[in-house]
Amino acid sequence: MQLPLALCLVCLLVHAAFRVVEGQGWQAFKNDATEIIPELGEYPEPPPELENNKTMNRAENGGRPPHHPFETKDVSEYSCRELHFTRYVTDGPCRSAKPVTELVCSGQCGPARLLPNAIGRGKWWRPSGPDFRCIPDRYRAQRVQLLCPGGAAPRARKVRLVASCKCKRLTRFHNQSELKDFGPEAARPQKGRKPRPRARGAKANQAELENAY
């Protein structure tokens, strides 16, 4: 009689334990691997998507590098450095009473934003293109008075001085002494050239010799 009573007590204890587990839910039940079993019928919510998610494979800025804070919108502008030169105007033995000041376009073309005293801006169409030079752009006329030795009467003369410079590029169609300007007008095809006649082959020459006989 004691054995059946003990079995009944064990069954009651096991039943009570299962009741307690069902009351607390499956989350309180752990298996041997110490893994929490999720509740049946419920699915874990997906993690919220970050607004500024940079791990996604998305093209940002149109596939271009981000805008540099020091770069201006018009970074294609290039200009010459302003160089002043003072000289006397001479005409034979006569020389001007006062020196004249003009610009010398011998500087190297560079970004206009980096040149504080830049003049005459041009467009840099291709950074890896041909060579660029700084050449005179506009001139101004100035009248100077020349003094001649020997007590001769002074005389006036009009000279042309450089007023501004600009950047021009060398092209592969010209040598380095010829410069080409920017813009769509620079890409004009050369007119007046006739196509070269094709050289005749040896077979054509042989046929003409046979017909000559």
From Swiss-Prot:
Q: Name one GO cellular component term.
A: extracellular space
What function does the entry list? Negative regulator of bone growth that acts through inhibition of Wnt signaling and bone formation.
Q: Which family does it belong to?
A: Belongs to the sclerostin family.
Stated name of the protein: Sclerostin
Q: Which residues are glycosylated?
A: 53, 175
Cystine bridges: which residues?
A: 80-134, 94-148, 105-165, 109-167
Which GO MF terms does the UniProt record name? BMP binding; heparin binding
Which InterPro entries does this chain map to? Cys_knot_C (IPR006207), Cystine-knot_cytokine (IPR029034), Sclerostin/SOSTDC1 (IPR008835)
Q: Where does the CTCK domain start and stop, copy by copy?
A: 82-172
Could you name the domain of life of the organism this protein comes from?
Eukaryota
- Which residue positions does the secretion signal occupy? 1-23
